[in-house]
Design a protein with these regions (language model features):
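Short sequence/structural segments immediately N-terminal
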Residues: 2-412
């Protein structure tokens, strides 16, 4: 064999080896990093196709804890009982995943979620009992009295279906009843395919819904010292830390999840964000929750990971004073409105007269904001976004009420 033939054979062999190497590197990581044949069959085949049509799905999955633990696509997309089945390139899957798919591995977390206001009460705040079974309503009422057994909100009829579907539902569907008998969708907080605790711990995740004039928690958080320090030091936090071993070394600055859900330094994990709340701050007149003492003790235990008992007690005492003062203002406005109805001055449907909107804004916007600001360290929201506009609307209500009475010949 001539030198030229040997050289040509070596070049061809090298080219083939290089091509094989480059082709292998181009394959999705999930095909090359997972060891079992079943995993390659399920996830590898899915990734091979979806990498061409929906690369972001494959990329997000590659970064997930599910991928690291060897959980394949089929294990999540396997139809749960009661779900619609679809034949998809040789696999029987469900494309409309719900909490029913997640509960197969995370049933304890799902049960905690069911007890929360994120579950059925979130949906019922818009649509009442629509779509919920009697058993689901009864279960929810056990833990959240009055949260589910209620009529649809007046805005459903007044604003129409499109406003609900593209507006309110985008947040309140976290508690939507599913055809498979489950409630909710875990991806509202954890996102699809990434299924990330990092994303769930970010304030911006909660801010998808907890923002705006009627529930301005993210705006209050960003003004607070907690929010300011988070913005400065977020890059130093271990947002990927395993939930069961989370400590203040990982999260030395709290996010929403740290205070309301995380287990930290031995404090128990919960997927019921109301478990540590001692008041119904969203209500017009705020009352203590049935588990007031236990809930407050749990939240104070979280606070104590960074703060002294004296400071914690002082903050709670001051916040409770704001709650009582806000209740007094709202109750005065309620009495005014009830008096108008009793005297036949105000007998039209809800939200049909300007005074209805002024009263609603007083408690639903300003009252809530004042109370949340007091508990979350947002001074400006207690005053200029809370008490000041409440005072302004109180004067406006009295003026409007007097004019209505004059028009009806029932002036006082």
């Amino acid at each position: 064999m001539s030198f030229r033939s040997v050289f040509l054979a070596l070049v061809i062999a090298f080219a083939l080896i290089l091509a094989a190497f480059l082709l292998n590197r181009a394959r999705p990581k999930i095909e090359t990093e997972q060891p079992t044949a079943d995993l390659v069959r399920a996830s590898g085949k899915c990734a091979e196709c979806h990498a061409r049509t929906q690369y972001s799905v494959v990329h997000e999955y590659e970064m997930s804890a599910h991928a690291r633990k060897g959980i394949n696509c089929l294990e999540c997309h396997q139809p749960a009982p009661g779900q619609e089945k679809k034949d998809h390139h040789g696999f029987v899957i469900s494309t409309k995943l719900t909490a029913g798919n997640c509960r197969g591995c995370h049933d304890g977390i799902y049960q905690q979620f069911l007890r929360s206001r994120h579950a059925a009460p979130a949906w019922a705040a818009i649509y009442g009992e629509k779509g919920l079974s009697p058993e689901q309503v009864n279960f929810s009422e056990t833990y959240q009295p009055g949260g589910t057994r209620r009529p649809p909100h007046p805005f459903v009829q007044l604003e129409g279906g499109s406003a609900m579907t593209s507006g309110c539902e985008k947040c309140h569907s976290v508690g939507k009843p599913n055809p498979d008998g489950t409630i909710g969708n875990c991806t509202d907080c954890h996102t699809r395919h990434t299924s990330s605790v990092r994303i769930a711990r970010l304030p911006s995740t909660c801010a998808q819904c907890h923002m705006g004039p009627d529930h301005s928690q993210i705006e209050i958080y960003e003004e607070s010292k907690h929010g300011i320090i988070f913005q400065a030091q977020a890059h130093l936090l271990n947002l990927d830390a395993p939930p069961k071993t989370l400590t203040t070394r990982d999260m030395f600055v709290p996010t929403c999840a740290t205070c309301h859900m995380s287990g930290i330094n031995g404090v128990g994990i919960t997927h019921d964000p109301s478990e540590r709340l001692s008041y119904y701050l969203a209500n017009a007149i705020t009352e203590k929750r049935p588990n007031y003492a236990a809930a407050q003790a749990k939240m104070k235990q979280v606070c104590s990971q960074c703060h002294t008992p004296a400071l914690i007690d002082r903050v709670y005492s001051q916040a409770e004073q704001v709650v009582q003062a806000t209740n007094d203002r709202v109750r005065s406005a309620q009495d005014l409105m009830n008096g108008l109805r009793k005297d036949g001055v105000l007998n039209s449907p809800p939200f049909s007269q300007p005074i209805d909107f002024v009263y609603f804004d007083l408690w639903h916007y300003d009252g809530r904001t004042s109370k949340h600001g007091a508990f979350m360290g947002g001074a400006d929201f207690v005053q200029w976004h809370g008490n000041y506009p409440m005072l302004q609307k109180t004067v406006e209500l009295r003026s409007m009420a007097a004019e209505l009475r004059r028009q009806h010949g029932k002036a006082k």
